[in-house]
Design a protein with these regions (language model features):
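Conserved SAM-binding loop
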Residues: 81-82
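A short glycine-rich, Lys/Arg-flanked "PGG" loop and its adjoining helix->strand segment in the class I
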Residues: 130-142
Length: 188
């Protein structure tokens, strides 16, 4: 309940940044984590735009032996995430600076096992959207997964992230609103 109240307060105050009408549900979060696939023991998972932490919690649970790093722009969400998910590393900042954050944490590109995103990328200004995709491409080596969710699969059909190959999407009806999980693989 506390997560929902926090989310709705931030959604009302910062609609463009939040980009959703409700926090992601646990079923969607579980599917997002499973879609990542297996990770090597030293791999980290980077989450972009964790919001209230539904995906963060699912990632920590699904990958108990791997480090989860979440990058969140909203300071209110950051404060709540740090308290709610102490096993995750929470970075307050912009997803477009992900390569810099990985360098600061001493994480090699080869050890980034996946990027998971809850960002409303297609609602962002085009320059920022491009910068975020560039950051994802710079961070992931070939063959590694990038998992995005959206409420509008149609909008994503017209947009394919440069440097990534799409895989079949999955509709998640047990979420409000229903969502689509979009898996991509970093191309060589």
């Amino acid at each position: 309940m506390r997560d929902a109240l926090c989310f709705f307060g931030q959604m009302a105050a910062k609609w463009r940044e939040t980009g959703a009408i409700a926090p992601s549900g646990p079923h969607l979060a579980k599917i997002m984590a499973r879609t990542v696939g297996p990770l090597a023991p030293n791999d980290v998972v980077v989450e972009l735009g964790p919001g209230t932490g539904a995906f963060t919690k699912a990632l920590v649970k699904h990958f108990p032996n791997n480090r989860v790093i979440a990058i969140e722009f909203n300071p209110v969400f950051v404060r709540n995430l740090r308290a709610a998910v102490p096993k995750a590393t929470i970075i307050e900042g912009c997803a477009s600076k992900m390569p810099q954050y990985m360098d600061e944490l001493g994480i090699e590109r080869e050890n980034v096992g996946a990027v998971v995103s809850g960002l409303p990328l297609l609602m962002m200004p085009k320059d920022l959207c491009r910068d975020v995709f560039d950051a994802i491409a710079q961070t992931l080596v070939a063959g590694k997964p990038y998992v995005q969710f959206t409420y509008s699969e149609r909008a994503w059909r017209r947009f394919e992230p440069p440097g990534f190959r799409p895989s079949p999407s999955r509709k998640v009806w047990l979420n409000f609103p229903p969502a689509v999980v979009l898996p991509f693989t970093r191309a060589s």
